[in-house]
UniProtKB/Swiss-Prot annotation:
Family of the protein in this entry: Belongs to the acetylglutamate kinase family. ArgB subfamily.
Organism, as annotated: Yersinia enterocolitica serotype O:8 / biotype 1B (strain NCTC 13174 / 8081)
Residues that hold ATP according to the record: D177, V178, S179, G180, I181, L182, I205, I206, T207
Organism phylogeny: Bacteria, Pseudomonadati, Pseudomonadota, Gammaproteobacteria, Enterobacterales
Gene: argB
Pathway: Amino-acid biosynthesis; L-arginine biosynthesis; N(2)-acetyl-L-ornithine from L-glutamate: step 2/4
UniProt site (Transition state stabilizer): K4, K213
EC number(s) reported in the record: 2.7.2.8
The protein's name: Acetylglutamate kinase
């Protein structure tokens, strides 16, 4: 099972406490191994503000010029990754902090020259992660990738999680601030097909970063040939059930 963490989760001690408590509860009761995938957009935005650097997004993806990729790598593969690792240590979970490039776990190529150092993620080699899981470690993987020519790349974490799930043949959960996809009245949609998603995007109900999230989930469901869950980390008591396959947010159907 791949669990992708997003939103302000990394900024909130209360949220991290809830999440890691749920992870401990799950691991005590269930055998299926977990892999954590994370971005850290809020953290990067804060850092950019402190350094007075512009934040530019194009179709929900962060434009990453050559003079910013080192900073973004430091925030995601450094601060965000090691913060999550620290929480795992605090909760007695044996974890290992990685990026997409470790063991070529996720293969990354440049996505679009106009976006700069932004990578496209595709399935890579499962060997390293499988070795760690077999030894009972929980991998925590940041969305920084490395191309074949050694360039660092910022990868959208939803898309990275999809490629990671494809690499491992695993189920995927996209955890964020929202309890799923909402309709025009703010009500949670329990199940979503590609047709329904296209309709809501055309109507302007699904917008901005949520378009990227929904498209990533649809791509994942199609490429994995299995449903993908979008859910909120806020419902901590429901998380162990979610990690065991019970939908609590929006289930994206292939």
């Amino acid at each position: 099972m791949v669990i992708k963490l997003g939103g302000v989760l990394l900024d909130s001690e209360e949220a991290l406490e809830r999440l890691f408590t749920a992870l401990v509860t799950y691991r005590e009761k269930h055998e299926r191994p977990l892999v954590i995938m994370h971005g850290g957009g809020c953290l990067v935005d804060d850092l950019m503000k402190k350094l007075a650097l512009p934040v530019v997004k194009k179709n929900g993806l962060r434009v990453t010029p050559a003079d910013q990729i080192d900073i973004i790598t430091g925030a995601l593969a450094g601060t965000a990754n090691k913060t999550l690792l620290a929480w795992a240590v605090k909760h007695d979970i044996n974890a290992v902090g990685l990026c997409l490039g470790d063991g070529n776990t996720v293969s990354v190529t440049p996505l679009d020259a106009a976006l700069g150092h932004v990578g496209k993620a595709e399935a890579g080699s499962p060997a390293l992660v499988q070795t760690l899981l077999a030894a009972n470690y929980m991998p925590i993987i940041s969305s920084i990738g490395i191309t074949k020519d050694g360039s660092l790349m910022n990868v959208n974490a939803d898309q990275a999680a999809t490629a990671l799930a494809a690499t491992l043949g695993a189920d995927l959960i996209l955890l964020s601030d929202v309890s799923g996809i909402l309709d025009g009245k703010g009500q949670r949609i329990a199940e979503m097909t590609a047709q329904k998603a296209e309709q809501l995007i055309a109507q302007g109900i699904i917008t901005d970063g949520m378009v990227v999230k929904v498209n990533a989930a649809l791509d994942a469901a199609r490429s994995l040939g299995r449903p993908v869950d979008i859910a909120s980390w806020r419902h901590a008591d429901q998380l162990p059930a979610l990690f065991n396959g019970v939908p609590i947010g929006t289930r994206i159907l292939a």
